């Protein structure tokens, strides 16, 4: 722990906590201050001035990053018949029906994304208490309840991310790995920022983006100037 503390202190010394950096500067600092002994994930965080208690100010959705996430997603699909075969052909890791429901209820959670055809939601609904808190429940808004299971699987494997504002208006998203070239991280960041900007509710008041930051796993949080995006 002592060694990590020294590394964190050294990283903190390189970052001015009172400054909002340009996206290029921030990405460079994330790479420079990373001290994890593995290929750390890079995440961005937005604090939005919204009231999620209002239906028209709830922000949730999905997008495909231009350069992917660098993470291998394990995709589970609830489908039957021809749709199950389409999911398998597209590269789904697990495909099934009631058998998967029983397995998940038994404690198995070795997957990252859950997709379902609309007709399967009746049985998937039984898993609400398990999948809901983990943000794994299929939802039409994120494209995970669909008849086009092949496309959904391919997107999930190819860099699709989901996002959702919490009760305090915070949104977090994975945009890549520290090993990514800086320009690819910048491009992913800008693509996600565009989505956040377009998601601004018409009824939102005041400064929409109260704070934007970027960090790596175990790394330092770095403020970003939204105008640089």
Curated annotation (Swiss-Prot):
One GO BP: translation
Top-rank taxon: Bacteria
A GO cellular-component term linked to this record: large ribosomal subunit
One GO MF term attached to the UniProt entry: rRNA binding
Presence of keyword Ribosomal protein: yes
Entry keyword set: Repressor, Ribonucleoprotein, Ribosomal protein, RNA-binding, rRNA-binding, Translation regulation, tRNA-binding
Keyword Repressor carried by entry: yes
Quaternary structure note: Part of the 50S ribosomal subunit.
NCBIfam families: rplA_bact
Role summary: Binds directly to 23S rRNA. The L1 stalk is quite mobile in the ribosome, and is involved in E site tRNA release. Protein L1 is also a translational repressor protein, it controls the translation of the L11 operon by binding to its mRNA.
Family (UniProt): Belongs to the universal ribosomal protein uL1 family.
Protein name: Large ribosomal subunit protein uL1
Native species: Streptococcus pyogenes serotype M3 (strain ATCC BAA-595 / MGAS315)
């Amino acid at each position: 722990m002592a060694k990590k503390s020294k590394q964190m202190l050294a990283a903190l010394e390189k970052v001015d906590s009172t400054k909002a950096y340009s996206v290029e500067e921030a990405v460079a600092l994330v790479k420079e201050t990373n001290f994890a002994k593995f290929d750390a994930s890079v995440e961005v965080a937005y604090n939005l001035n919204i009231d999620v208690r209002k239906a028209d100010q709830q922000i949730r959705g999905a997008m495909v990053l231009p350069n992917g996430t660098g993470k291998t997603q394990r995709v589970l699909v609830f489908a039957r018949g021809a749709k199950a075969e389409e999911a398998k052909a597209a590269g789904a890791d697990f495909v099934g029906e009631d058998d998967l429901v029983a397995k998940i209820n038994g404690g198995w959670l070795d997957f990252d994304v859950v997709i379902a055809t609309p007709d399967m939601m009746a049985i998937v609904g039984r898993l609400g208490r398990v999948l809901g808190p983990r943000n794994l429940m299929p939802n039409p808004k994120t494209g995970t309840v669909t008849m086009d299971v092949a496309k959904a699987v391919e997107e999930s494997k190819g860099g699709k991310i989901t996002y959702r504002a919490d009760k305090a208006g915070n949104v977090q998203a994975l945009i890549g790995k520290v090993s990514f070239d800086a320009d690819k991280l910048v491009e992913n960041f800008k693509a996600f920022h565009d989505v956040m900007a377009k998601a601004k509710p018409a009824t939102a008041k005041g400064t929409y983006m109260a704070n934007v930051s970027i960090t790596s796993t175990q790394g330092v949080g770095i403020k970003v100037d939204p105008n640089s995006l």
